[in-house]
UniProtKB/Swiss-Prot annotation:
Region of interest (Disordered), ranges: 451-481
Record function comment: Involved in the unfolded protein response (UPR) during endoplasmic reticulum (ER) stress. Acts as a negative regulator of the EIF2AK4/GCN2 kinase activity by preventing the phosphorylation of eIF-2-alpha at 'Ser-52' and hence attenuating general protein synthesis under ER stress, hypothermic and amino acid starving stress conditions. Co-chaperone of HSPA8/HSC70, it stimulates its ATPase activity. May inhibit both the autophosphorylation of EIF2AK2/PKR and the ability of EIF2AK2 to catalyze phosphorylation of the EIF2A. May inhibit EIF2AK3/PERK activity.
This protein's name: DnaJ homolog subfamily C member 3
Disease linkage: Ataxia, combined cerebellar and peripheral, with hearing loss and diabetes mellitus: A disease characterized by juvenile-onset diabetes and neurodegeneration, resulting in ataxia, upper-motor-neuron damage, peripheral neuropathy, hearing loss, and cerebral atrophy.
One Pfam family in the UniProt entry: DnaJ
Annotated gene: DNAJC3
CC per GO annotation: azurophil granule lumen; cytoplasm; cytosol; endoplasmic reticulum; endoplasmic reticulum lumen; extracellular exosome; extracellular region; extracellular vesicle
Gene source species: Homo sapiens (Human)
């Protein structure tokens, strides 16, 4: 149940509260209604006062059905419609009241209010003038005179708005229309005119807001739905564009412009949905191809080019193609320097390329625009660890492989280097010591990078063979001497070592 106070507030916002009181206190007996109709009217009045609008409406429906010539039944039903925000339904009832009882000034005054809000200024003025000629109460007379002055002001502003629009002064036209629409809030034509001004001024989202209101205020407003759809499309919001153009076709399935636009939006939407599904499945190369098709399908709207390149940048980054990712992400960032998604994806590509300073810079820029993003925070911490790590021992550099190298590449590089730096190949004592140190590093790199768990730790900026990195200090239990590597077979894939190194 709605509280009576809230109903009073809603009623008062629609028309003068005094008129509601007139309605509620008006005695139905004056119409000579039968007992059943009188019962419905009285019960409906009580329900309305209690805020039970739907139940009150049912009672007044019954009263109208029971006595189609009862002006009080129509008037009270109009009151409920207005309280429910259904002004379109209230207007015919008020007109019926006036037809049945020409001197019912309360109904005529209420209708004048509605007509004024709809922007039907001539009709509203006619009602207010007739109220003044019908022996109104003091309050009704004041209200009618006030509304006549307001209507006259709206006429003047409308003329100024149309002149400004015609001369191409859209800023002035908007200023005039703003004032009119504070009063004529339900005028669909004026909202459509202001939407055109917003479009001319490069403010499409404000235009959409007015057009959405116009689509509700005017029945079968296919033109509004078409314009909303095209505006969303130009903004790059293909999903909302598709939704709005479908509303147009629901009203008129043969609407030529809506149907042509529908086919274009649907084609683009299908490509984008397919590309996103491929990304979710990890099929980044195929997704890239789809987004290239998006750019070819709609080359004239820059928004689709930017969004497509943003997603291609993401695909290259996730597919560990850092050179391509950096190139495309940079193209996006030239157009949108604050694009957080492109900054994150380029930062990840920089990490693969071991460009840690650049990665840190991108993460920090992204964090300025989205400080609560956990992915950015973790990425920045990782980049900082890797920068610090790069200043120490880098197992990837030791083996001469990229950070995204496969295990097979790592083993191949290890075997080649282990053979090259085998200490038995060196006779000079100094060279042998250098080779021993080099061989230890090579073996350590192979041990870390060929083990998924140890490699992940290293990729996250932690050296699994460095006790200080793992424990914050102390000795290094994993730092091995040359003697500990004797018997290590660089050409074995696992199991007991059969190959022995021999020293003089």
């Amino acid at each position: 149940m709605v509280a009576p106070g809230s109903v009073t507030s809603r009623l008062g916002s629609v028309f003068p509260f005094l008129l509601v009181l007139v309605d509620l206190q008006y005695e139905g007996a004056e119409c000579g209604v039968n007992a059943d109709v009188e019962k419905h009217l009285e019960l409906g009045k009580k329900l309305l006062a209690a805020g039970q609008l739907a139940d009150a409406l049912s009672q007044f429906h019954a009263a109208v059905d029971g006595d189609p010539d009862n002006y009080i039944a129509y008037y009270r039903r109009a009151t409920v419609f207005l309280a429910m925000g259904k002004s379109k339904a209230a207007l015919p009832d008020l007109t019926k009241v006036i037809q049945l009882k020409m001197d019912f000034t309360a109904a005529r005054l209420q209708r004048g209010h509605l007509l004024l809000k709809q922007g039907k200024l001539d009709e509203a003025e006619d009602d207010f003038k007739k109220v003044l000629k019908s022996n109104p109460s003091e309050n009704e007379e004041k209200e009618a005179q006030s509304q006549l002055i307001k209507s006259d002001e709206m006429q003047r502003l409308r003329s100024q708005a149309l002149n400004a629009f015609g001369s191409g002064d859209y800023t002035a036209a908007i200023a005039f229309l703003d004032k009119i629409l504070e009063v004529c809030v339900w005028d669909a034509e004026l909202r459509e005119l202001r939407a055109e001004c917003f479009i001319k001024e490069g403010e499409p989202r404000k235009a959409i807001s007015d057009l959405k209101a116009a689509s509700k205020l005017k029945n079968d407003n296919t033109e509004a739905f078409y314009k909303i759809s095209t505006l969303y499309y130009q903004l790059g919001d293909h999903e909302l564009s598709l939704s709005e153009v479908r509303e147009c076709l629901k009203l008129d399935q043969d609407h030529k412009r809506c149907f042509a636009h529908y086919k274009q939006v649907k084609k683009l939407n299908k490509l984008i949905e397919s590309a996103e599904e491929l990304i979710r499945d990890g099929r980044y190369t195929d997704a890239t191809s789809k987004y290239e098709s998006v750019m070819k399908t709609e080359p004239s709207i820059a928004e689709y080019t930017v969004r497509s390149k943003e997603r291609i940048c993401h695909c290259f980054s996730k597919d560990e193609k850092p050179v391509e990712a950096i190139r495309v992400c940079s193209e996006v960032l030239q157009m949108e320097p604050d694009n957080v998604n492109a900054l994150k994806d380029r930062a990840e590509a920089y990490l693969i390329e071991e460009m840690y300073d650049e990665a840190i810079q991108d993460y920090e820029t992204a964090q300025e625009h989205n400080e609560n993003d956990q992915q950015i925070r973790e990425g920045l911490e990782k980049a900082q660890r890797l920068l610090k790590q790069s200043q120490k021992r880098d197992y990837y550099k030791i083996l001469g492989v990229k950070r995204n190298a496969k295990k097979q590449e790592i083993i191949k590089a290890y075997r080649k280097l282990a053979l090259q730096w085998h200490p038995d190949n060196f006779q000079n004592e100094e060279e042998k010591k250098k080779a021993e140190k080099k061989f230890i590093d090579i073996a350590a790199a192979k041990e870390v990078l060929s083990d998924p768990e140890m490699r992940k730790k290293f990729d996250d900026g932690e050296d699994p063979l460095d006790a200080e990195s793992q424990q914050g200090g102390g000795g290094n239990p994993f730092h091995r001497s040359w003697n500990s590597w004797q018997g290590f077979n660089p050409f074995s894939s696992g199991g007991p070592f059969r190959f022995k190194f021999h020293f003089n």
